[in-house]
Amino acid sequence: MTFNLNVKYRLIALLIVLTANSSCTKEEYVTIDSKPVVADLTQVPYPKLSDYNFFEGALKNLKPAFGVLPYKPVTELFSDYALKKRFVWMPNGTKATYVNDYSVLNLPVGAVLIKVFYYNNVQPSNSTKIIETRLMIRKASGWIFAEYIWNNEQTEALLITQSTTRQISWSDSNSVIHTIDYRTPEVDFECLRCHARFNNELIEPLGIKPQNINHAINYSDGPKNQLNKLIEFGYLENNLPENIVSTVDFEDTSKSLNLRVRSYFDINCTHCHIDGGESTMHNLRFAFNETTNPMKMGVGAHAAHYLEGYNNVTVTPGNINKSILHYRMYTEDDLLYIMPPLGRTQRHEEAIQLIESWINSL
């Protein structure tokens, strides 16, 4: 499927000509050509990110082309403090449909999800550095992955299939320098670990769920609720319920501690701890619609893995030092127990503080 509509914007210039005796108004039409997004399902993935025309102008500026809409989960997946920008594009005349609050929107064939990973204040130049862009493209046979690595000049990103590693140093808001070996996923295997349901061979996106995007973000025409924006633009069927049970920003202290914890677990843990997920055999289920039962989050629950000194309990109420869940989120060097096992080498300090407060409150 190719979206090759010749997109042209017609700007109306109103020229008011004033004379001593009369006035008139004249309309002039200026046609400005804009390259259309290209996503031919018989040809993708393309060798270069620029081949899709997702962005206008200099690629590194990430200025979305017409039809490429940003979206953002209210709480995001942690990836060693990488910053992220997300976009969705759909072929002309297609739209997604609502399934339920907690399931991914049913996106049409030809839809593309775009996720850009970058850091600010990268040393030694204290500049922004884009590392990778991941695409999920929906073909008639299902979703495929495409991984693009940005060059040092930040002018292009090239398709790869193997994992890569590069050292990144950046300065945080307290001027502390962090250095990591940033590793990109091996597409044909590691992407599946989070996105696949092995009980039915289903591959699906993760974050673009009504419960996660039911809040406002800034668009070029101002702030707007993301679901409303998708409907307004013609990307989402207007069949949503009046009320959507939604996750919250895990750092929003105006929300209850329990809601914040459940929201963090939902976006960071659910994709593995779900029926058919990589950790389906464990007794934990972190989906937001399931964690009204605290045992689903491991409270007082028997742990699947033995860890000496922890009494084999996932979460021991009031005691972080007897809670295996806390240890697995806290450790940076125990590769057997680090959680999650992919995409994290740094401790997520803000989340650790949240989990400690939660466990101590139980």
Model-derived features with residue positions:
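Sequence context surrounding c-type heme c attachment/ligation sites in exported
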Residues: T25-D33, V104, V122-L362
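Bacterial N-terminal signal peptides
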Residues: I12-N21
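Bacterial Sec-dependent N-terminal signal peptides
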Residues: N21-Y46
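Short, well-ordered loop/turn sites that connect or cap secondary structure elements
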Residues: L107-G110
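Bacterial N-terminal signal peptides that target proteins for export
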Residues: T2-L11
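Short, structured beta-strand/loop micro-motifs enriched in basic residues and often containing a Trp
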Residues: K85-Y98
